[in-house]
Amino acid sequence: MLRWLCLYSALCALTHGSSARSLEWFTALVRTEYTEPLTNSSVTGSTESGRYGDSSPKESVKGFVGYPRDPWQLEGCHPDTQYIVPGTSAAAAAGPDSEWTQPWIALVARGGCTFKEKVFNAANRGASAVVIYNEAKSGNATVSMSHLGTGNTVVIMVSYPKGMEIMEPLRRDIPVKMVITVGTRHVQEFISGQSVVFVAIAFITMMIISLAWLIFYYIQRFLYTGAQCGNQSNRKETKKAISQLQLHRVKKGEKGIDIDAENCAVCIENYKTKDLVRILPCKHIFHRLCIDPWLIEHRTCPMCKLDVIKALGFWVEPEETLDIHVPDSIAGSSLSIGTVSITQEESRSEGNNLPSSSTGSSLQQSNSVKDDAGETTALLDDPGNDNAAATHTQDSH
């Protein structure tokens, strides 16, 4: 996920660097001055309320302000537009043949034609600069103006309120002197529409890839969780089956196992007195603490690879541990049985034919263990029977 975000950021940066363009524009400081006839006082105003046109020279200019004579031609779109410059001698209209020779600035309204036409018409009448005031609905806003090919004529735009402020004394035939100077430089960066579409497509693509990756991730996680739950269920069944295996505690002096020679095949340590061992169906013996974790993970005997769980498939009932006392008649056997674990099912099936001591069953199990003595595994007995075994051996001689 982090790699995709880094790739997207790099892509956006590359797109921004290659497709972004910067727009440079300058504000105009507009200063006006006129004399109020009624009070004979000077009224001045200076605000950074103008904006230079894109193709206008960024220069300062000054002069008296003129405006279109015809109220229906305030936009200055007609080539024959006549301008009045208050304060001129004989109130002459500005034009090519006018006696007015000082620089003057045309004040026209926005709309009716292109900015370029307005500038051309005013320049043909001798204006050294053109001030265009915005529409009333735009309030105090100004916009960029494109007017290629207008030469050295300075062009600025002011807001509608500022235009009306300048127009008010002109309509009373009061000369207004204006000074335009360069204001603050502004740089505005923007991205083209094509770049925006490209970045949007790239972003959507990244989101789709990320969503697909998340869906894949959570599906895998769900499957893994389900498998874990299944494994836990199997582990519970395995533990339940392992609990049915016989347990025996090693006793000192037992002949079925040589404590000094025999060892657990899992931990490779010799059996010690009082060690608790588990007897598998294949008659192999291991430490309980060693073989139980092994069976939970592998289910097979470490030595003969017998599947212990399958071998215990017939042992479906919980185990019941019974103490079986070995009679003296079989005490001389090389292997003897101390405590043996049998299931409730076997106990019930043979309970009606055997006495409470279960002597016949113990004899059968003893013979079975003797047949497997060559595998060095045994069910061990109490050391108290050692003397009886020795006596039996002497009598046989």
From Swiss-Prot:
Position of the signal peptide: 1-20
Key word Electron transport present: no
Pathway named in the protein's UniProt entry: Protein modification; protein ubiquitination
Main enzyme class: transferase
Pfam families: PA, zf-RING_2
Catalytic activity: S-ubiquitinyl-[E2 ubiquitin-conjugating enzyme]-L-cysteine + [acceptor protein]-L-lysine = [E2 ubiquitin-conjugating enzyme]-L-cysteine + N(6)-ubiquitinyl-[acceptor protein]-L-lysine
Organism domain of life: Eukaryota
Zinc finger (RING-type): 264-305
Alphabetical keyword list: Glycoprotein, Membrane, Metal-binding, Signal, Transferase, Transmembrane, Transmembrane helix, Ubl conjugation pathway, Zinc, Zinc-finger
Regions that span the bilayer: 196-216
Free-text comment on this protein's domains from its UniProt entry: The RING-type zinc finger domain mediates binding to an E2 ubiquitin-conjugating enzyme.
Chain's role: E3 ubiquitin-protein ligase. Ubiquitinates BRAF, inducing its proteasomal degradation.
Listed name of the protein: E3 ubiquitin-protein ligase RNF149
Source organism phylogeny: Eukaryota, Metazoa, Chordata, Craniata, Vertebrata
Name of encoding gene: rnf149
